[in-house]
Amino acid sequence: MKKALIFFGTIVWLLTSCHTIDNPVVTIKTEKGDIEIELYPNKAPYTVYNFLKYVEENRFEGATFYRTVRIDNQPNNDVKIEVIQGGLYDDNHPQALSPIHHETTKETGIKHLDGTISMARNEPGTASSEFFICIGDQPSLDYGGKRNPDGQGFAAFGRVIKGMDVVKKIHQSPAEGQWLKPKIKILKISGKREQLLKVLENWAPQK
């Protein structure tokens, strides 16, 4: 029995190891500087796949950082957060892809810590092109958190590894309420093509 368990465990390890992939890194080049982000396809495959589709197909062309959420500009929210939000801004934008499966932090284990990148959404399963980056730890955005009344949290899928100073510059840029004035242009989002294609070709979600 013990040998059988060891054999079974070995098979499980081999199967799971065959389906792991190196974490790709993308660079968000903005007017304020560059932000490097490591993505976690092994933990959040649907969300990373979606984001990299936008990158590989140049669907983020014309994207901006347009929203800054600070402690002093959310007077009507009992649960306050600090993030910057970017993307195409329009859910009906011609470059937008269909909404994706909502991967909760309970599923992925990726918490909303300082520098975490995550998907903006309305209802669960409506995220598409809009994303945000956390300034400081934001546990209220995790599964079970109270920022969104449905308690499903937001789909985190990576973390800033270089350029948090740029994130903070954007966060403190001039704004009217939560809306950056002017918006901060995203000049390009790119990564090593072989890394991106490895995810897109070998990690296509089935859900």
Task: Spell out what each predicted region is.
Residues 17-207:
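Cyclophilin-like peptidyl-prolyl cis-trans isomerases
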